[in-house]
Amino acid sequence: MSILNPRTSLEAGDSEDACCAAMASVCCINTKEDADSPSAGLPSGTTQNLDVEEIQGYDVEFDPPLESKYECPICLMALREAVQTPCGHRFCKACILKSLRNAGHKCPVDNEILMEKQLFPDNFAKREILSLRVKCPNLGCTDTMELRHLEHHLVQCQFASVECSQCQGSFLKLLLDKHMEHECGRRRTFCDNCGLAMAYEDKSGHELICPMAYVTCDYCQTNLIREQMPAHYSMDCTMAPIPCMYCEFGCREKMQRHNLAGHLQDFTQAHMRMMAQTLRSFSTTPTSHISDISFCDPNQFEPVPLSVAPAHPSHMPSQQDCSQETRNLRETVEQLEGRLVRQDHQIRELIAKMETQCTYVNELKHTIHSLEDKVADMDAHRCNGVFIWRIKGFSGLQKSQEEEKPVVIHSPGFYTGDPGYKLCLRLHLQLPSAQRCANYISLFVHTMQGDYDSLLPWPLQGTIRLSILDQSESTARQDQVEVMDTKPDLLAFQRPTAPRNPKGFGYVTFMHLNTLKQRQYVKNDTLLVRCSVNIHLDLTSPRREGFQPRSGEGTL
């Protein structure tokens, strides 16, 4: 009876026969069922050597809650590696072994004499416990599974805390990849200038010293890589302050490099006097102080500062030595004066060439501007009444509008045909403080003086279609469109008497700025405005007057 119903025999625990029957039933259980235990595959000797005293019951949340018959009386948790005593009580293997070794050989429940060799594994209870469903202990995870599958789930659970291998921080597994690729301060990155690999948090510091990074000259605002900047300061920068080349003779002037030539030209006589004064000081200087000066190469001449004091008469060299030194100094001065004259001529020639080049550059700029105007005029003639206005840098215009700065821009002129009327568009971003039209895009059409005004009938009559284009990739684009007919009695459509008619015609509330966010009206920071004009050449045809219907897309 106890073999067929082992649960009853285990729960009773009142008679020695019942305990023996439970032991017999457990021993008959298939070894495949024992494999549910983490230590089932280990040899018996290995299992005995494990530090089982440190392993208590399963501290997990069961769903439904754990029945009391599966609780260990010692650790009050679910039985782990359940064993049964001859007196019919169940314990975790580690718990009862620790109790027997620390508290003596007795059962903790009824104080019956109990030896370690009397314990036997309760595989039936073990299998029952491993079949119970438990909740994942990781915060945020709602999965439940059998206890035997919990360890495998914890390995794969996306809500488990794992350590970042780069910064050693703790993160949820599902967020680890994003952290390591985009957020980790120690993630690997490369300098945009020199290509050096480094941690992301070190990049900003590296940019301050990167030899290949572009920096701006403090004087001329030229952009150069950092390693070129010292040579630029000392050799090329026309705005860098430099001392006069005669500073060693006593000139204390400092000027920008491009002003050096003018300074040398204006102070030639002063420089000569400084040189003469310096040379006179040599005549009263001991030979030992000037013996190091080589008079063979004037390019290497290094004058002694003016602060050198005259020597005591007792140390004066002989008259013959002074005469020879004076002759050498005079030769040096003559050579330097010759060099100065040649350099003065070279400077004058360079100034003349520079003026010629400046004139030539100005002529080229004028030619370029003329060509640009011609190209723009050709484009205006070629549009044939359909004009697309590309407004670049639209985010900057919106920022100015948000700062209560007026934003009014005009498009280039365009023709309705060849010959045709010349028109332009005006876009106005209404300020947030504007009454009745705050934060709206206003769009108007203006007539302009064109090449064919004398050949065309006035006032202008036709239909004008204004659109702000949806730049999304989908086929179901939703352009913001308004259509209006011209009104001949308005000044906006009369022949203009100024380059651009100050009177325009259009919509004050063409489109709300918030509508731009609903579709991709702005792409690559560019807004596209399309104007299509259909001219009515038959002056006797009836014209549509009165209220002009508006598209429903422009309303909020």
UniProtKB/Swiss-Prot annotation:
The keyword Transferase applies. Homotrimer. Homooligomer. Interacts with tifa. Residues 384-533 form the MATH domain. Pathway: Protein modification; protein ubiquitination. Its EC number is 2.3.2.27. The gene is traf6-a. Highly expressed in ovary and moderately expressed in kidney, spleen, stomach, colon and testis. The lineage of its organism: Eukaryota, Metazoa, Chordata, Craniata, Vertebrata. The MATH/TRAF domain binds to receptor cytoplasmic domains. Belongs to the TNF receptor-associated factor family. A subfamily. A zinc finger (TRAF-type) spans 148-204, 205-261. It catalyses: S-ubiquitinyl-[E2 ubiquitin-conjugating enzyme]-L-cysteine + [acceptor protein]-L-lysine = [E2 ubiquitin-conjugating enzyme]-L-cysteine + N(6)-ubiquitinyl-[acceptor protein]-L-lysine. Keywords: Cytoplasm, Lipid droplet, Metal-binding, Nucleus, Repeat, Transferase, Ubl conjugation pathway, Zinc, Zinc-finger. InterPro entries: MATH/TRAF_dom (IPR002083), TNF_rcpt-assoc_TRAF_met (IPR012227), TRAF-like (IPR008974), TRAF1-6_MATH_dom (IPR049342), TRAF6_MATH (IPR037309), TRAF6_RING-HC (IPR027139), TRAF6_Z2 (IPR041310), Znf_RING (IPR001841). One of its GO terms (cellular component) is cytoplasmic side of plasma membrane. A zinc finger (RING-type) spans 72-111. Gene3D superfamilies: Apoptosis, Tumor Necrosis Factor Receptor Associated Protein 2, Chain A (2.60.210.10), Zinc/RING finger domain, C3HC4 (zinc finger) (3.30.40.10). It is found in: Cytoplasm; Cytoplasm, Cell cortex; Nucleus; Lipid droplet. Its main location: cytoplasm. One of its GO terms (molecular function) is tumor necrosis factor receptor binding. E3 ubiquitin ligase that, together with UBE2N and UBE2V1, mediates the synthesis of 'Lys-63'-linked-polyubiquitin chains conjugated to proteins, such as IKBKG, IRAK1, AKT1 and AKT2. Also mediates ubiquitination of free/unanchored polyubiquitin chain that leads to MAP3K7 activation. It comes from Xenopus laevis (African clawed frog). PANTHER family: TNF RECEPTOR ASSOCIATED FACTOR, TNF RECEPTOR-ASSOCIATED FACTOR 6. GO terms for biological process: activation of NF-kappaB-inducing kinase activity; innate immune response; lipopolysaccharide-mediated signaling pathway; protein K63-linked ubiquitination; regulation of apoptotic process; regulation of canonical NF-kappaB signal transduction. Coiled coil: none annotated. PROSITE patterns: MATH, ZF_RING_1, ZF_RING_2, ZF_TRAF. This is TNF receptor-associated factor 6-A.
